[in-house]
Amino acid sequence: MNNNLPTGSIAAVVDLLNKENVIAYPTEAVFGVGCDPDSETAVTRLLALKQRPVDKGLILIAASFEQLKPYIDDSILTAAQRKAVFDCWPGPVTFVFPAPATTPRWLTGRFDSLAVRVTNHPLVVALCNAYGKPLVSTSANLSGLPPCRTVEEVRAQFGDDFPVVEGATGGRLKPSEIRDALTGELFRQG
């Protein structure tokens, strides 16, 4: 069975997400795997697939800042900090924001913060808009293997039955940069 999901079948992808499935999709640099951030079942599936401990925390990718607001606390950002963030968005820079106590631990891990990004990848923007919220986003690769850059690489690592949204990555060579929204500290070079 081939579970390739053509870019025109966003409704089919949303249906899979609503059923707590993990999917693969192209992002700015590599393919990502993602799921519904509000579903502990889906996130647990993603973590098991990636062999990733829950305490590391995850990244949310969204079409707009509004989609991220329920998961973060931006109230303590100064005007300058807010400008630094919004000058980079939409785009391939992930920012770590304080997280309110209501943000699930399966997203934040051992932290009181959450990494989030407003993407400029058109397919991911369309997907998040159709879904009405952000997606958990982590690189599509099994532990110890390089991140996938093509549908074929996703198939090779995850199998032919794994649902993959067809499309091209944004052409960036490195994963997104990660910075602290409050301090500007660089956690990962992009």
Swiss-Prot record:
InterPro entries linked to this entry: DHBP_synth_RibB-like_a/b_dom (IPR017945), Sua5-like_dom (IPR006070), TC-AMP_synthase (IPR023535), TC-AMP_synthase_SUA5 (IPR050156)
GO cellular component terms given for this protein: cytoplasm
Reaction catalysis annotation: L-threonine + hydrogencarbonate + ATP = L-threonylcarbamoyladenylate + diphosphate + H2O
Keyword Signal included in the entry's annotation: no
Any GO BP: tRNA threonylcarbamoyladenosine modification
Family: Belongs to the SUA5 family. TsaC subfamily.
Function, in words: Required for the formation of a threonylcarbamoyl group on adenosine at position 37 (t(6)A37) in tRNAs that read codons beginning with adenine. Catalyzes the conversion of L-threonine, HCO(3)(-)/CO(2) and ATP to give threonylcarbamoyl-AMP (TC-AMP) as the acyladenylate intermediate, with the release of diphosphate.
Record protein name field: Threonylcarbamoyl-AMP synthase
Gene of this entry: tsaC
